[in-house]
Amino acid sequence: MKKEEEEINMKKILSIIVGLILISTITSCQNDKKIIENDLKNLIEFTRNGGYKSSNHDKMAAITFEAIDEGYKKMSYKINKTTEENKNKIIVNITIKYPDLSGAIEIFKNKILEERQRLLKSPNPTVRSDDEMIKLTTQFLKESVNEKLNDPNLRYFEDTFDIVYVKHNDNWEMQDSPQFNKAMLFNLHFNSFTQN
């Protein structure tokens, strides 16, 4: 895939995380800070408990979520403080500790290259259907992530950052947060797959 397509896929995946349980729109209420805190907790727990499986999303997102599912069991978070900056802006300060799975992409690349070499050496290489390719890709990515998660030298990141909510027409919307997206995808960089 081209780098631009990978970036588009990453944006789709990240937007799915943000929109999984319609967190982008929260009905205005008496205690907006508490509602926003609870909704953020619900989004994280929904993702950690596999709720994304019931969402409609593209194949790349489905493969990614299925592969990184085990990582959510090793993730922890704490909402430190919620501040109402003004009547239209609330800031949630959160700390998320998550496994660094960035090395899983290199493992995944190697698995793909090994499969390619195996097919090239085969006297009768098999042409796979799209469904077979998706299944194989999912398997390789899941194996790569699990290999990284089971590594005794697995590193963790612990990041503290703000998530901003802005009120539009009496509804609260979570603003894009690259730090939140990085944590929820465990520092995976799919655009690195096309490099080298």
Residue ranges and their predicted role:
Residues 88-98:
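A short hydrophobic beta-strand element
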Residues 99-101, 171-172:
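Primarily extracytoplasmic ectodomains and periplasmic/lumenal surface modules that are beta-strand-rich
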Residues 25-28:
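C-terminal motif of bacterial Sec signal peptides marking the signal peptidase cleavage site
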Residues 100-156:
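Mixed-charge, low-complexity intrinsically disordered segments
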Residues 2-3, 7-13:
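Positively charged n-region of N-terminal signal peptides that target proteins for export
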Residues 30-84, 103:
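Core segments of small alpha/beta cavity-forming domains
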Residues 13-23:
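Sec-dependent N-terminal signal peptides
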